């Protein structure tokens, strides 16, 4: 559209706040412009003078509040520090814990009497090594349980020989020392016998199903796919990336170690890289192999771990270790076996056609997490040592070490003074839907230790042998200590599980035999015990609801002593207690004095009818 503005007249201002004057020059407004136009924002006089006088002066930047507080300039606005309150640790040692009352389960299904079904495997890839001259098929495990989110899973089978706990521990095929299906991410691929693993994605770690707790153990790992072994392809400057078909890391890791990263990222794993043979712990790499030497395809790496006896290990985590008395903790000439109170707080559940256990897993402690990822080299109370007083997780095991061999040649011992792992150095996660209470976080389920661990990246693959026949074999012991394949721990763990199942059945029979109800506790139901809970209250309202109902029911009434609890827990039968019947107090006193206590209770609550069930929930 053509403009109709007269020639010679100035165009209106593009500023929306500027008024348009008529051609006659008479303003629309008689008053000042700044008083009538609310949208106008005239510049201050100081700014106007600054613009006319010269360039704008540089604005002085004010320090942030944190800097002013650090310099002491804003003391009047610094909030008062809250008074530090010491958190009372209610955790009990594993030796003082009792079995949780078994859940009220329905009768086992006919399928529960059968062993767990073998895992379904789907073929994903095949790898061939020209150096070794062998091929491997790798499969993914379909619908597998994975230990994550603070929980650990195992398999159960119904057994009529265990009428109180109804189920006992079992495993899935293959029945040998191998990599664990449950202790590995979904991205890990296995071969048929689960002795070789690989992944096509980023770093993932697989742990074995056997662990070392004391003694000296050995396993071998052969590189299937990794850094190429052709010496002509090696870089000349030593800084370029080596040609490879993937990368791997080998070592040992505890249950707290993350499986979605490589071994050695945190304090819970010790590993060695294939590139340059660097050892890794706390996410820090150190040169270990000679310059220019790496771990390539076809190499056999031997991993040897040495741990002190559990008896000395227990004194270290309890803070009673004396170097002058206990010495350097050599395993020679010391009895390795000791009585361990295995506490397995488990919830049974059906998973497809199998029956499984769910229990709390151990979780990383704040002290070791800060020590691994913070810039400070040492914690507040000094570096980790057997005598560290800050936390049990910062204590180390004297005499422990990890030695590495390459193709039968000893490369050295890069790791010494490994971190202690017995509770309270390892703590169970407090899951509210898994019978988790603070009192039981120090429970030892018998499977806390150092596991063989392998990490793969971008197609790297490793095959392991945890027992003979070996590719090379363990070395000769320098001090006469026996060196065993860590695969021997598989049969030992079966024996330990069987013994623990029998102990659980006997304890459940003595403590909980003939008692009905859903709310449970340990042998001391007077409010002074551990207060462990279970049953349908846990499945309905969580641990908190069940625990509160148990405490309120037990503490109701004038008397809350053991004799009162004895008659208020459930069906106590006849009031005449004979020598052929064991009461609640009898079962609790069997382990103390050796014989049942058949004394008549001193008093009975008036509101309890003998011979009837009392619902505590």
From Swiss-Prot:
Low complexity compositional bias, start-end? 1-19, 40-50
GO MF assignments:
transcription cis-regulatory region binding
Q: Where is the composition biased (Basic residues)?
A: 57-69
Q: Which GO terms describe its cellular component?
A: chromosome, telomeric region; Set1C/COMPASS complex
Alphabetically ordered keywords of this record: Chromosome, Nucleus, Telomere
* Main subcellular localisation: nucleus
**Stretches the record annotates as Disordered:** 1-89, 595-617
Question: Does Endoplasmic reticulum show up as a keyword for this record?
Answer: no
Its subcellular locations are: Nucleus; Chromosome, Telomere
Domain B30.2/SPRY stretches: 157-380
**Subunit description:** Component of the COMPASS complex.
**What is known about what this protein does?**
Component of the COMPASS (Set1C) complex that specifically mono-, di- and trimethylates histone H3 to form H3K4me1/2/3, which subsequently plays a role in telomere length maintenance and transcription elongation regulation. Controls the production of several secondary metabolites, including astellolides.
Protein name from the UniProt record: COMPASS component cclA
């Amino acid at each position: 559209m053509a403009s109709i503005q007269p020639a010679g007249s100035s165009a209106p201002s593009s500023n929306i706040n500027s008024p348009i004057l008529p051609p006659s020059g008479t303003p629309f407004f008689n008053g000042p412009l700044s008083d009538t136009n609310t949208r106008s924002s005239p510049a201050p006089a100081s700014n106007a003078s600054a613009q006319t006088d010269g360039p704008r002066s540089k604005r002085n930047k004010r320090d942030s509040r944190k800097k002013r507080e650090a310099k002491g300039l804003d003391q009047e606005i610094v909030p008062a520090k809250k008074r530090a309150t010491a958190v009372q640790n209610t955790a009990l040692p594993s030796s003082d814990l009792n079995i949780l009352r078994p859940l009220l389960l329905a009768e086992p299904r006919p399928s529960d009497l059968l062993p767990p079904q073998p895992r379904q495997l789907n073929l994903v890839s095949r790898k061939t090594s020209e150096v070794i001259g062998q091929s491997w098929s790798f499969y993914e495990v379909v619908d597998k349980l994975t230990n994550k989110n603070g929980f650990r899973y195992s398999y159960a089978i119904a057994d009529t020989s265990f009428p109180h706990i109804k189920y006992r521990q079992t495993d899935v095929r293959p029945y040998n020392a191998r990599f664990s299906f449950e202790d590995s991410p979904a991205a890990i691929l296995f071969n048929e016998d689960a002795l070789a693993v690989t992944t096509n994605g980023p770093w993932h770690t697989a742990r074995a199903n056997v662990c070392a707790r004391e003694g000296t153990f050995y396993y071998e790992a052969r590189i299937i796919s990794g850094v190429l072994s052709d010496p002509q392809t090696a870089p000349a400057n030593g800084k370029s990336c080596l040609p490879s078909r993937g990368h791997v890391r080998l070592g040992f890791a505890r249950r707290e170690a993350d499986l979605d990263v490589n071994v050695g990222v945190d304090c819970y794993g010790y590993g060695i890289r294939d590139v340059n043979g660097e050892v890794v712990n706390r996410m820090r790499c150190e040169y270990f192999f000679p310059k220019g030497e790496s771990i390539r395809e076809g190499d056999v790496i031997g991993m040897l771990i040495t741990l002190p006896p559990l008896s000395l290990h227990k004194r270290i985590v309890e803070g009673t270790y004396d170097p002058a008395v206990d010495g350097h903790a050599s395993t020679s000439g010391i009895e390795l076996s000791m009585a361990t109170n295995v506490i397995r707080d488990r919830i049974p559940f059906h998973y497809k056609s199998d029956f499984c256990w769910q229990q709390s897993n151990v979780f990383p402690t704040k002290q070791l997490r800060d020590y691994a990822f913070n810039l400070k080299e040492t914690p507040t109370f000094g570096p980790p040592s057997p005598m560290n007083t800050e936390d049990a997780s910062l204590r180390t095991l004297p005499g422990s070490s990890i030695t590495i061999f390459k193709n039968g040649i000893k490369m050295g011992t890069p790791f010494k003074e490994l971190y202690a792992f017995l509770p309270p150095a390892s703590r169970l996660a407090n899951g509210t839907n898994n019978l988790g209470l603070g009192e039981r976080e120090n429970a030892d389920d018998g499977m806390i230790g150092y596991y063989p661990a392998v990490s793969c990246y971008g197609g790297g693959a490793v095959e392991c042998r945890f027992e003979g026949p070996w590719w090379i074999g363990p070395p000769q012991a320098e001090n006469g200590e026996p060196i065993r394949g860590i695969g021997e721990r598989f049969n030992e763990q079966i024996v330990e599980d069987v013994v623990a199942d029998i102990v659980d059945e006997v304890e459940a029979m003595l403590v909980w035999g003939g008692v009905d109800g859903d709310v449970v506790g340990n042998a001391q139901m007077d409010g002074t015990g551990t207060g462990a809970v279970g049953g349908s209250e846990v499945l309905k309202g969580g641990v908190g609801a069940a625990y509160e109902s148990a405490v309120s029911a037990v503490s109701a009434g004038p008397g809350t002593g053991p004799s009162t609890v004895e008659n208020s827990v459930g069906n106590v039968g006849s009031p005449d207690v004979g020598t052929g019947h064991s009461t609640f107090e009898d079962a609790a006193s069997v382990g103390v004095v050796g014989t049942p206590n058949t004394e008549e209770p001193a008093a009975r609550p008036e509101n309890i009818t003998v011979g009837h069930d009392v619902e505590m929930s």
